[in-house]
Regions:
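A non-transmembrane, solvent-exposed segment enriched in polar/low-complexity residues
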Residues: 1-80, 90-91, 97-115
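N-terminal "domain-start" segment that seeds a small globular fold
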Residues: 204-243, 293
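Short active-site neighborhood of thiol/selenol oxidoreductases, capturing the structured segment around
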Residues: 239-270
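Non-catalytic, surface beta->alpha helical segment in thiol-disulfide oxidoreductase systems
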Residues: 307, 313-325
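Structured, charged N-terminal subsegments at the starts of enzyme catalytic cores
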Residues: 106-161, 169
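Start-of-domain marker
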Residues: 1-10, 140-145, 156-165, 176, ...
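A cross-family structural signal marking well-folded subdomains
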Residues: 148-203
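Thiol-based oxidoreductase modules, predominantly thioredoxin-like and allied folds used
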Residues: 279-298
Length: 325
């Protein structure tokens, strides 16, 4: 392994990697911290896996946690301005005080970035920042509201240097451009309105900025809770259909292409629903290129159809209550 231009030997003994560094004490210190941290984390995982059979392992786990806590903090206090200190702050786990024992996850979510030196641009040369962001946004923010996520983003951006801010913004752009949870489209809109439309960001050209703003403007009209855009199309039987004329407790907008295998499967399901449910009306809209004479490109743009099938669920007032189901 080549680390900071120094020679590193990767040796294996009994299945455990032992790393030796030649020519640099500082680099050696990094690997020592990494090795001790990884070893103790693996030990805790092993102890946790046996808790069902050995409940007393909980005391060993607490002991290892305390050891790592003291070990990491001693490095930070001894070398506060070093990159080793930054490295330790990024690999150490956020710990909730004992008084927050019953609400530790809430504490961690609210203090996750407090101790991170997000003005140290050297961190961009590693995966440490990405790893930290992955854990926070993929785990802790997974079930949070868009409003809460936006609050955390604003705090994170405010705390970061310009270089780290640029990296974080593109990371968030990638994550929320087409989010798994449709409600998080509000997060993308927030990113555009507050950052991508206003700031000078690395690699953000005028053309890219315009396209990003355009997509946010489309999304803000079709987020959950908004009224569906007006829809006119010609169905497979040559009949003109208007969404405004449809009266039902629930309305499914099913955008599909005939050569899409998942569309074929889903269309059978929705055809069955249409026949068996009196309170559900299904509008199946063929958006294939061959059908553009019956379905305008405006529909594809208005409803932000990037993949097929795309599905919207409306209530009796034509309000969007779910998307991408």
């Amino acid at each position: 392994i080549d680390f900071d231009g120094h020679i590193v030997e990767d040796l294996f003994e009994k299945g455990v990697a032992k790393i030796k560094v030649k020519g640099s004490k500082e680099t050696s210190d990094y690997f020592e911290v990494y090795s001790k941290t990884a070893h103790n984390q693996l030990y805790m995982m092993a102890l946790k896996s046996e808790l069902e059979y050995f409940p007393e392992n909980i005391y060993k786990i607490d002991s290892v946690k305390n050891y790592l806590h003291d070990y990491h903090n001693s490095i930070i206090s001894k070398r506060p301005d070093s990159f080793l200190s930054t490295y330790v702050k990024f690999i150490k786990e956020v710990e909730a005080p004992k008084e927050y024992h019953d609400n530790s996850e809430s504490y961690i979510m609210n203090h996750y970035f407090d101790d991170l030196p997000l003005n140290d641009n050297r961190i961009l040369n590693s995966r440490l920042l990405k790893n930290k962001l992955d854990i926070f946004f993929n785990h802790y923010m997974q079930s949070q509201t868009p409003e809460f996520i936006c609050q955390k983003i604003d705090y994170l951006i405010e705390k970061s240097s310009a270089e780290l801010r640029n990296y974080i913004l593109w990371y968030l752009y990638s994550k929320y451009f087409n989010p798994d949870n449709a409600r998080n489209e509000l997060v993308f809109i927030h990113l555009v309105d507050n950052y991508f439309s206003k700031l000078e960001i690395d690699n953000l050209t005028d053309n890219i900025r315009r396209e990003i703003i355009k997509r946010a403007d489309v999304l803000r009209k079709i987020t959950i809770g908004n009224q569906s855009p007006t829809l006119y199309y010609t169905d497979d039987n040559g009949k003109m259909v208007s969404l405004d004329a449809v009266n039902s407790k629930y309305i499914v907008l099913f955008f599909y292409k005939p050569d899409c295998q998942k569309c074929i499967k889903d269309k059978r399901y929705f055809d069955y629903i249409k026949k068996t449910r009196d309170d559900v009306e299904v509008l199946s809209i063929n958006i294939s290129e061959d059908n553009y004479k019956n379905v305008s490109q405006d529909i594809v743009n208005q409803f932000d159809i990037m993949i097929t099938p795309t599905i919207y669920l409306l209530d009796e007032n034509k309000t969007i209550v779910a998307k991408h189901i």
